[in-house]
Amino acid sequence: MVLDVLDNFGKYAALNPYFSLVDAFMRTHQLEELALGTYNIKGEDVVLKIEQAMGKSRTEAILESHRQMIDIQIPLQQEETIGLAATVSLPAADYSAEKDISFYPNSPVQNYVTCPRGGFVIFFPQDAHAPCISEDASFTKAIFKVRCV
C-alpha cells in the first residue's frame, strides 16, 4: 500500500509500467471536472471510474481485495478513511474472477489510513481494503484500476 499526495504520483511509475499512463492522464485532465462514469484509458488494462460513493461507518465497511488489478483511489471532494489488512492474515474468501474481487465480511481491519483531498492510495493484491469510511452520506472519488504485470 502507498499513501501520498498527487504531486508525487510520478515517483511511483517504476512500480508498474501502466502507472506512467495514469500519471499522464492526471496531468492532462482535471479529475474533479470529469462526469461520473467509466473511462477506458488503455483498453481494460487501465480504467478510470469516477463514482459517487456512499459514506460508511467503520463497522459497515467491508474488507475487499483484487487479484488482477491494482486500485489507485483518490477522494475528490474531501478526505476518506480506509481500513486495511494484509490478505495473508485473512481467511480464505470466495473470489469473483468476473469482477476481480474477494470480500472478507467477518474479518477485522488491522489499521486505518486517512487519504486527504489531493492525495491517493495505491492498493496492491496483497492489500485488503475497506474503502468509503466517511461521515458524509456520499462523496465523489476516482478509482484507477490498473492491471498487475
Residue spans for each PLM region:
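Glycine- and acidic-residue-biased ligand/ion/polar-headgroup-sensing regions
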Residues: Q68-I70, I74-L84, V88-L90, A97-F103
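Short beta-strand His + acidic residue motifs that chelate non-heme Fe in jelly-roll/DSBH
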Residues: I82-G83, N111-T114, A128-E135
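Conserved metal-binding segment of the jelly-roll/cupin
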Residues: Y104, V113-A128
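A generic structural micro-feature
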Residues: E64-H66, D136-S138
